[in-house]
């Protein structure tokens, strides 16, 4: 097993005891909750006459079901209104801080935690959402959990888990223009597979990772689960510290920053740390990556041919055939020129301010293609305000994009933003499963934000490197 890694250090520091079944009971430093996975858990503890153990270490928001076009209450969707009302009641009764739309701090849970400064290195963080691994970008151990585990954390502020192995993914090389963090993680998943990380936590390291901004690191850690890993993380460094120092929490508590920084530095993986596996990726060889199929692992470079199913591993042949039939693609073709109907720029993977800035540089002075629905959904109200102050909203709207309010939106079919029929969508989100965006016949092509912008302008999957970027004022 691994030794001397950040994962080992933080795990051991938070271990309360080892249970008879061999699992470790861990103290949870931050519990993030939202409206979809928490109601049943609250109901369970109420039935037992229990209270929330640590409301001060619990933070709530609404993101999955919240409409992005019109957020006036009551919501037009009765189910969404019911979930929102239940969450409001539960957090009020328990005294839990709630970033709801009236606060100006609402947004996707994996966007608001970091931007408010409550996501910190060395914390154990859980949330009833599979993309909780996003917070690992800060050197936290962050895990998605199910309803029964949410119940346990609400009641005890602890969780029972099995310790995983650690795989170091060393990424080197300078990224080509138009290639982003999203392309790195799509390539990792393509190479290792959607089940390649089962039993592992991924440590992302190497000069390429170190040169990424925090938003890029979050994009990579966000999709660890798509690669089968239980979590993913990056060792904290000066980029991390500079980002955190500007957040509300540390602006209000500067003494805490100075107090915690030595601890953050101490949890970094040792130079001689031992890993269970090491994988090397040369990111300098990457082109923009897009998916051709119905799993995030079915990706190719924009210039590469769609594979022949028979050339894949035996257990992937039938899946590839079904995916190609659903997506209406043929082996040997490239994805460049694939017609799209919708362009979605949003999600907890790619809806932060730098994502929107990069996309705006492609969009500025251009127009969305005829017959394409294109919209931008900022990851949080803070991102939304900042983007509007910078003039990004105007750039997108002048090009023909819809500018929406913060929420999960079309990343998943749980709100009003959904594909219709067999529409094809260029999406900056994290999953392209059949039916993921609301229609069982819908087709999703995952790509980085600038590639989404390029697809919106051209009406087809295009190589963003062929479009000149415009300098923003």
Swiss-Prot record:
This is 3-isopropylmalate dehydratase large subunit. It catalyses: (2R,3S)-3-isopropylmalate = (2S)-2-isopropylmalate. Keywords: 4Fe-4S, Amino-acid biosynthesis, Branched-chain amino acid biosynthesis, Iron, Iron-sulfur, Leucine biosynthesis, Lyase, Metal-binding. The lineage of its organism: Archaea, Methanobacteriati, Methanobacteriota, Stenosarchaea group, Halobacteria. Its EC number is 4.2.1.33. CDD domains: IPMI (cd01583). Catalyzes the isomerization between 2-isopropylmalate and 3-isopropylmalate, via the formation of 2-isopropylmaleate. Disulfide bonds: none annotated. [4Fe-4S] cluster binds at residues 348, 408, 411. One of its GO terms (biological process) is L-leucine biosynthetic process. GO terms for molecular function: 3-isopropylmalate dehydratase activity; 4 iron, 4 sulfur cluster binding; metal ion binding. Its cofactor is [4Fe-4S] cluster. Binds 1 [4Fe-4S] cluster per subunit. Belongs to the aconitase/IPM isomerase family. LeuC type 1 subfamily. SUPFAM superfamilies: Aconitase iron-sulfur domain. Pathway: Amino-acid biosynthesis; L-leucine biosynthesis; L-leucine from 3-methyl-2-oxobutanoate: step 2/4. It comes from the Archaea. It holds the Pfam family Aconitase. InterPro entries: 3-IsopropMal_deHydase_lsu (IPR004430), Acnase/IPM_dHydase_lsu_aba_1/3 (IPR015931), Acoase/IPM_deHydtase_lsu_aba (IPR001030), Aconitase_4Fe-4S_BS (IPR018136), Aconitase_4Fe-4S_dom (IPR036008), IPM_dehydratase_rel_enz (IPR050067), IPMI_cat (IPR033941). PANTHER family: 3-ISOPROPYLMALATE DEHYDRATASE, HOMOACONITASE, MITOCHONDRIAL-RELATED. NCBIfam families: leuC, PRK05478.1, PRK12466.1. It comes from Haloarcula marismortui (strain ATCC 43049 / DSM 3752 / JCM 8966 / VKM B-1809). Heterodimer of LeuC and LeuD.
């Amino acid at each position: 097993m691994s030794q001397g890694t950040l994962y080992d250090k933080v795990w051991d520091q938070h271990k309360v005891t080892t249970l008879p079944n061999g699992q470790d009971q861990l103290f949870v430093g931050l519990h993030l909750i939202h409206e979809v996975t928490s109601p049943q858990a609250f109901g369970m503890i109420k039935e037992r006459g229990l209270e929330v153990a640590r409301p001060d270490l619990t933070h709530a928001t609404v993101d999955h079901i919240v409409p992005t076009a019109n957020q006036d209450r009551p919501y037009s969707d009765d189910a969404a209104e019911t979930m929102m009302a239940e969450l409001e009641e539960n957090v009020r009764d328990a005294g839990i801080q709630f970033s709801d739309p009236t606060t100006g701090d609402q947004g996707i849970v994996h966007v608001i935690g970091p931007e408010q400064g409550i996501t910190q290195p060395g914390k154990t963080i859980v949330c009833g959402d599979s993309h909780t691994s996003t917070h690992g970008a800060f050197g936290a151990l962050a895990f998605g959990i199910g309803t029964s585990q949410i119940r346990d954390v609400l009641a005890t502020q602890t969780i029972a888990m099995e310790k995983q192995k650690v795989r170091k993914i060393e990424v080197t090389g300078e990224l080509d223009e138009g290639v982003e963090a999203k392309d790195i993680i799509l390539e990792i998943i393509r190479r290792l597979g959607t089940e390649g990380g089962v039993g592992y936590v991924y440590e992302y390291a190497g000069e390429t990772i170190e040169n990424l901004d925090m938003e890029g690191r979050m994009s990579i850690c966000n999709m660890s689960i798509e690669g089968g890993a239980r979590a993913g993380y990056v060792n904290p460094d000066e980029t991390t510290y500079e980002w955190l120092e500007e957040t509300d929490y540390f602006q209000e508590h500067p003494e805490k920053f100075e107090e915690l920084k030595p601890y953050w530095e101490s949890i970094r993986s040792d130079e001689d740390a031992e890993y269970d596996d090491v994988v090397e990726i040369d990111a300098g060889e990457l082109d923009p990556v897009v998916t051709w199929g119905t799993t995030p692992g079915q990706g190719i470079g924009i210039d590469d041919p769609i594979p022949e199913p028979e050339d894949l591993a035996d257990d992937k042949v039938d899946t590839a055939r079904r995916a190609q039939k659903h997506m209406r693609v043929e082996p040997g073709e490239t994805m460049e020129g694939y017609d799209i109907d919708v362009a979605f720029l949003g999600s907890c993977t790619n809806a932060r301010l730098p994502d929107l800035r990069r996309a705006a540089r492609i969009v500025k002075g251009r127009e969305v293609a005829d017959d394409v629905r294109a919209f931008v959904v900022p990851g949080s109200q803070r991102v939304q305000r900042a983007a509007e102050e910078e003039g990004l909203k105007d750039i997108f709207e002048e090009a023909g994009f819809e500018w929406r309010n913060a929420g999960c939106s079309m990343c998943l079919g749980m709100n009003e933003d959904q594909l219709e029929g067999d529409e094809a969508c260029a999406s900056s989100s994290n999953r392209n499963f059949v039916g993921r965006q609301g229609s069982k016949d819908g087709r999703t092509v995952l790509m980085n934000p600038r590639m989404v912008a390029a697809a919106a302008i051209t009406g087809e999957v295009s190589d963003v490197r062929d479009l000149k970027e415009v300098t923003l004022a």
